[in-house]
């Protein structure tokens, strides 16, 4: 890889892209943010608005309208562009529309000499991250999807509300597809250092309460989309967290969409799992110790993604 500084190129300034840009600028994560969008007038307004807010941020981030030529020396290209999820529409139903959009974007990025990392947020994110990897020709460690970073945040937040403890003291992951087949990993989860597995053994009535929390986690996007049209702030902050881990070389475990090479008995798919993130991208995938029931649910999630992936990228082609 070759790049200078911490320039981030954001492609797509819709609700998610702008929320990410705001989080990035507000937290002072990048040196420079170049934004590309097909709506030039709205983009100009967003760039002005964000630039004025830099005065009160902790770090001076240069925000400007970008072009694909800015990708040449960028550390990261973050893709938030694509058709939006409509009320009642699953993430996987978006796939046909958005794969073609990814192909066009990635071709432009790579044609301009990009040699950094891709971070993909467009849904269905696991499938589209695989598509970006295929279209780019980069090593899979350099193509990352937002995965279950938002689902995990939602799950930890709701557990924190139940137990009246900070979500930062909760270590519990949502893994699998960022979508309807995702699953919680309770067998290795802890709350303030206390094993959730042991809590379940002591209190069998806890299981249905936790299942309800998981269902609320899984279905949160549908409720938010129905209420306000899109999800934006949570995923924007999740993307900013991944970006900070990369640019600051943090070697931190985050639940992202990562390429599997035998972990969990699966390979050649992108799927949500904890992974160690540093300046090089995905340093390694963390294979959690999960129960037989959790493994069965994970396999179902992987098979769901694989079926869609194989339709787009047939095996052997």
Curated annotation (Swiss-Prot):
Q: Which UniProt keywords apply?
A: Allosteric enzyme, Cytoplasm, NAD, Oxidoreductase, Phosphoprotein
Q: Tell me where it resides.
A: Cytoplasm
A biological-process GO annotation:
lactate metabolic process
Active-site residues are: 178
Q: Which reaction does it catalyse?
A: (S)-lactate + NAD(+) = pyruvate + NADH + H(+)
Could you tell me the EC number(s) of this protein? 1.1.1.27
The record's InterPro entries line, in alphabetical order, gives: L-lactate/malate_DH (IPR001557), L-lactate_DH (IPR011304), L-lactate_DH_AS (IPR018177), Lactate/malate_DH_C (IPR022383), Lactate/malate_DH_N (IPR001236), Lactate_DH/Glyco_Ohase_4_C (IPR015955), NAD(P)-bd_dom_sf (IPR036291)
One GO cellular component, as annotated = cytoplasm
The family database entries (SUPFAM superfamilies) matched by this protein are listed as: LDH C-terminal domain-like (SSF56327), NAD(P)-binding Rossmann-fold domains (SSF51735)
Residue positions annotated to bind substrate are 85, 91, 123-126, 151-154, 231
Q: What is its main location?
A: cytoplasm
Specify whether Phosphoprotein is a keyword of the entry: yes
Q: Under the GO molecular function aspect, what terms does this record hold? A: L-lactate dehydrogenase activity
Q: What does this protein do?
A: Catalyzes the conversion of lactate to pyruvate.
Q: How does it assemble?
A: Homotetramer.
What NCBIfam families is this protein classified in? Answer: L-LDH-NAD (TIGR01771), PRK00066.1 (NF000824)
| Family to which the UniProt record says this protein belongs | Belongs to the LDH/MDH superfamily. LDH family.
Quote the protein name from its UniProt record.
L-lactate dehydrogenase
């Amino acid at each position: 890889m070759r790049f200078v500084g911490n320039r981030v190129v954001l492609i797509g300034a819709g609700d998610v892209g702008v929320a990410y840009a705001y989080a990035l600028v507000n937290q002072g994560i990048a040196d420079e943010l170049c934004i590309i969008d097909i709506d030039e007038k709205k983009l100009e307004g967003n760039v002005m608005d964000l630039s004025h807010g830099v005065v009160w941020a902790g770090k001076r981030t240069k925000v400007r309208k970008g072009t694909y030529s800015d990708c040449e020396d960028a550390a990261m290209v973050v893709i938030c562009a694509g058709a939006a999820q409509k009320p009642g529409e699953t993430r996987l139903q978006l796939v046909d529309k958005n794969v073609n959009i990814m192909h066009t974007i990635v071709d432009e990025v790579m044609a301009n000499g990009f040699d950094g990392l891709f971070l993909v947020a467009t849904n269905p994110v696991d499938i589209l991250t695989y598509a970006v990897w295929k279209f780019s020709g980069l090593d899979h460690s350099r193509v990352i999807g937002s995965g279950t970073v938002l689902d995990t945040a939602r799950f930890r937040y709701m557990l924190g509300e139940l137990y009246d403890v900070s979500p930062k003291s909760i270590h519990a992951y949502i893994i699998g597809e960022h979508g309807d087949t995702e699953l919680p990993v309770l067998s290795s989860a802890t709350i303030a250092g206390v094993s959730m597995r042991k809590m379940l053994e002591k209190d069998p009535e806890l299981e249905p309460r936790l299942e309800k929390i998981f269902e609320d986690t899984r279905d949160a996007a549908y409720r938010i989309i129905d209420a306000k049209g899109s999800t934006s702030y949570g995923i924007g902050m999740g993307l900013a967290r991944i970006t900070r881990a990369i640019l600051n070389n943090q070697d931190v475990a985050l639940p992202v969409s990562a390429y599997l090479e035998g972990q969990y008995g699966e390979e050649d798919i992108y799927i949500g799992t904890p992974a160690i993130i540093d300046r090089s991208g995905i340093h390694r995938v963390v294979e959690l110790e999960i129960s037989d029931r959790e493994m069965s649910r994970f396999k179902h999630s992987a098979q769901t993604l694989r079926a869609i992936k194989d339709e787009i990228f047939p095996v052997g082609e």
